[in-house]
Amino acid sequence: MNDFDSEVISIFEETNALLKWHFILRSGMRSGHFFQCAQVCQHMDKVTRLATLILKTISFKDINTIVSPAMGGLVIGQEIARQLGARFIFLEKVNDRLALRRNFSLDSKDRVLLVEDVVTKGGRVREALDIISKYECELVGAVSMVDRSSEELNFGVPFEALLKMNFPTYEADKLPQDLLNLPATKPGS
């Protein structure tokens, strides 16, 4: 745990963003815990504080462009960009795949940091990094508010998270009894 973990957890709890139930995650895995970052993102004072904490804890420097995948990373990515005085662009879903649209582009002057809300298995981060790597920019690294993965993630670039929480995840056919007793829900992701 870092110096800010208890504050970050408190922010998630105060905003009802740390949920407990039987959830189907975007990865298809099941969990008894879910970070619904959209609940935090309703409160810009909390978003501002989380962005400030992220910038205090990350080691990435001289960033001039923030890229976030829609939807989860948009609000926190934009606030980090605002605090840095950096440009903010986003990737959005087209036919369930991420794409860089709206005449957004990256070039050799861009030092890019990818910002996401929550990482579990890293699929969305990998997809976003694949898109960014097609441009002649310098990809500095990736950061998330929450890393809930149970293993060390390797994205081919440095990855840091404000909060590391290892809640267990399960295959649908290997659920513990407490989750078997609850109907599964797929929260917005």
Show which residues each predicted segment covers.
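PRPP-associated nucleotide enzymes
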Residues: M1-S189
